């Protein structure tokens, strides 16, 4: 798998270069990404409910951060979170990009510091992510349009057996039943 070199960035020791392995893009990336952009545009109106889902995911895992994001093109857009930042992040550095690459099972990294795919990843190297668990959010067409994930700065070796099932159930609750959309003016 090819590695990725991030541009020079400031570290506590001066300037550095990050080398790590980004997730591959799915074969259906073009249609998946377009669907994710539409989903994000539509779901943003339901921010209070998304925040409650993030809060619940954070509580289930007893972690520092939980969030709901859309992965569109080369960006991860964190739409709702509990305990952290919202905004845009480079897809190449986002662990959630692995969820959209392999969407049919929960993606869990108990110790990101020991996983060679993430050696050099700035979120891991800077101590922001030691543990990660994420589940895909699907649209009505079955495309992985978003991610519900939880992170913690320290690795978590012991995870409740049903925690990933609960995270999956919460991810399914993010996108409500599809309602007919009104036509978009051209």
Predicted regions span which residues?
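Intrinsically disordered, low-complexity terminal regulatory regions
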Residues: 2-94, 162, 166-186
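Short hydrophobic/aromatic beta-strand element in the GNAT-like acyltransferase core
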Residues: 65, 134, 147
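Residue-level signal for well-ordered alpha-helical scaffold segments within enzymatic catalytic domains
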Residues: 98-102, 140, 169
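A short, aliphatic-rich beta-strand micro-motif
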Residues: 130-139
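Flexible loop/coil segments at beta-strand boundaries within sensory signal-transduction domains
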Residues: 138-143, 153
């Amino acid at each position: 798998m090819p590695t990725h070199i991030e541009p020079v960035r400031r570290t506590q020791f001066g300037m550095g270069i990050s080398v790590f392995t980004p997730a591959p893009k799915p074969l259906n990336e073009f249609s998946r990404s377009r669907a994710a952009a539409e989903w994000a545009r539509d779901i943003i109106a339901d921010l209070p409910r998304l925040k409650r889902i993030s809060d619940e995911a954070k509580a289930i895992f007893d972690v520092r951060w939980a969030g709901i994001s859309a992965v569109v093109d080369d960006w991860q857009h964190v739409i709702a979170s509990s305990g952290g930042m919202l905004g845009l992040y480079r897809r190449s550095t986002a662990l959630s990009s692995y969820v959209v690459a392999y969407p049919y099972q929960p993606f869990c990294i108990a110790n990101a510091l020991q996983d060679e795919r993430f050696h050099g990843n700035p979120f891991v190297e800077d101590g922001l992510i030691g543990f990660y668990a994420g589940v895909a959010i699907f649209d009505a067409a079955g495309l992985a349009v978003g991610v519900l994930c939880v992170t913690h700065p320290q690795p978590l070796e012991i995870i409740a057996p049903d925690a990933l099932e609960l995270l999956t159930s919460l991810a399914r609750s993010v996108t409500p039943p599809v309602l007919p959309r009104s036509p978009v003016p051209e």
